[in-house]
Amino acid sequence: MIWGPDSPYWLIRKGRIDEARKTVRTRLMSPTEEVDPDAVLSMMVRTVEVEREITSGTRFVDIFSRKHLRRTEVVIGCWAVQSMTGWVVTSYFAYFYEQAGLPSVKAFDMEVGQGGLGFICACCAFWLSKKLARRTHMMVGMVIMTTIMFLIAILSCVRQDTGLGYAESVLAMVWWGVFQLTVAPATYEIIGETSALSVRQKTIGVGRIVYNILGIVSSLITPVMLNPGARNWKGKSAFLPALLNFFLNFWVFFRVPECKGRTYEELDAMFARGVPTREFKKYEFDLYADVD
């Protein structure tokens, strides 16, 4: 990060045009490219100007207006999905493994291995994102993760021993891998494409606030559910995210539109026309027709 260049867009927004030009010439362009760096810089300057024109005069309350409410719901809902899919289990993985019956050292080793698995799956998600549609990407992950959470909870209802503890822990690791492959990256794809340009920063910001609030709630209730001195539910705690996921699957199916391959102009027109969620993927229209 010490040697990383500042974004030319950020420099332009700060009025540091000469520094932005230098960054474009030295850091963002290959010596073999036959492109005029000044032309690239001019395009960036124009982009920043258009961005300012679009976002000027907007307020946070605008994201809840009739015009933007549907899009705001999708953004906030996807942030909530990302947070709530693994409630309880994901907040304290090592502690969960220990409560499932693993020795402390093994529980720590499992969490370290889980970190490596998550990194590999996150890298593979780049490839998967190109192959799958946005809705499919999220829904496939949701279905698999819901199933895994139910399996963890059901196994915990059986008489506990070390073997079942390892089974629950392995399932939790698989859940984490699936999460990094699907719901985690799909959330960022969807919120970036669904939010309106004029209020994008505000919409995503409010959604992230909701995500953080849900994370705080999870961190408060998890110790109570897992701790032997409190509820002592152990793996049965997975019933909570499993049930949440079950209902969230329906929300994703009926409310999250397919935006892959659409321009922002097309998406604005489709939301303005009230295109049903499941018709987004195949919807065809005259982009320049009047919009009510």
Residue ranges and their predicted role:
Residues 37-40, 112:
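Short, conserved alpha-helical segments within structured domains
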Residues 27-38:
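Short intracellular "coupling" helices and adjacent cytoplasmic loop segments at the cytosolic face
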Residues 1-25, 49-292:
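Alpha-helical transmembrane bundle of multi-pass membrane proteins
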